Structure formats: C-alpha cells, structure tokens
Amino acid sequence: MALLEICCYSAECAVTAQQYGADRIELCAAPKEGGLTPSYGVLKSVRQTVTIPVHPIIRPRGGDFFYSAGEFDAMLEDIAMVHDLGFPGLVLGLLDEDGNVDMPRMRQVMTAAKGMAVTFHRAFDMCRNPRQAFDKLAELGVARILTSGQESSAEKGIKLITELKAQSGVPIIMAGAGVRASNLEIFINAGVEELHSSAGKWTPSPMRYRNTGLSMSTDAEADEYSRYGVEGESVAVMKSIIERHHV
C-alpha cells in the first residue's frame, strides 16, 4: 500500500495529520519559503505528541540549494539536534554551483545522520541531470528522493517519476508537488510507493485588530493575517483512496 506523507508547518498540524491518517510527517517552518528548519521548541513538542514517524527538514534559508560554509555548518548542527531528539529521519538537499549533487557535503551529511533515514528533497528537481543525480544518491545510501519529476507539479512530471522508479528500488521515489485527492490515482496506478502532500489551506488569522498600514514582511503584498495549516479531512480522503486501491 502506498505511504502517505504529509508536510506540516506546526506541531498542531502534525497532530492533525496523524489523527486523520498520515503515515509519516515532514516537519517544516515557513510555508512561504517552501519549508525551513523548524525551531527547537516545535521539534520537541512534536516528539512529545506525535507517534508516527516525523522527518524534519534541514534547510537554513529559502532560495537555491548551494550553501555557504557557515550555512552548511549550521545544517550539521541542526542534524545533530534532530538526532539527539530521537527523530528517525530528516529531509535535506545540497547542490554544487553547477547543479550537481554536492557529493563531499552529502557524505558529511550521511555520516552526521548516524543511521537516520535521509530524504533528498526537491533540490533534486533543480539539478542538472536527474538520472545521474539518482545514481549518486543511491551510491550515498539516501533512503528516498522527493520529486515532482522536474516539472511544476508531480502530475506533469509523472513520466520522469515512473522512469526513475523503474531504475531501482532504492532510493525510493516519492512523488510530491500538487499531489491531492483529485489526482492521487494517477500515482497509485503508476506504482508510486510514497506520496507527499501538504493537504493544507490558508485560513484567516483570528486577530480582530489589524494594522493594515504596514507590513512585517519584505513582501509588501503578502497577507500577514492568514495562516497555513493541514486540512484533516483532505488527509482522510487521500488515505481512504489509498486504502481502497490496496483491497
């Protein structure tokens, strides 16, 4: 049966995802940045309240996946923190200046992970040569690759996803980006083993007083009075579709 991973941006969302049937959680902060390393407080809370596997993302900033020496040092410290808190896995991705998997740094990551399962995230979709990158990640012992098939959505990238899946059973190919109940059967019928979805929506902030005259964001157009969270019913619907196909 296909595994359903839900991307969560708070401890509360992680609890919701678990309650509605998620098999695993990718834990992040900052949805508008595409996911950054969660705070220690959030990580600790999730370890105390969630029993299904949780894999935190290790990503110090938004943007590209070529990191400075200082940023990489911070990532190694965060990996140590995640390990010490007892998480079974983590999510990250590193590329070099030429868009290839940064093998020297990834070797350091695999050592620092100390047996935690490593997911190489959608940095894979920004690499120069996906088939070569797949082989390199297999060589490293990466557990899985999260990918949209180098397209804007996994549905559009299904051709590459199925081709990579056919190469080898390891790393596992996990489809992500625009995966939802309405297109889930495409991936299930293609034999994709793991599915990644945010299953979320933006909801209005509960604040009654709103100072609309200024913004705390560098994006002046950003709506600071909305919050992103997991929609439990969406998780439940996807889980039911997966279970129905397993019968």
Swiss-Prot record:
InterPro entries: CutC-like, CutC-like_dom_sf
Disulfide pairings: none
Keyword tRNA processing: no
Lineage top rank: taxon: Bacteria
A single GO molecular function term of this UniProt record: copper ion binding
Localization in the cell: Cytoplasm
A GO cellular component annotation in the UniProt record: cytoplasm
Gene3D superfamilies cross-referenced by the UniProt entry: Copper homeostasis (CutC) domain (3.20.20.380)
UniProt KW keywords: Cytoplasm
Entry-linked NCBIfam families: PRK11572.1 (NF008603)
Family: Belongs to the CutC family.
Entries under HAMAP family matching the protein: CutC
Protein name: PF03932 family protein CutC
Species of provenance: Enterobacter sp. (strain 638)
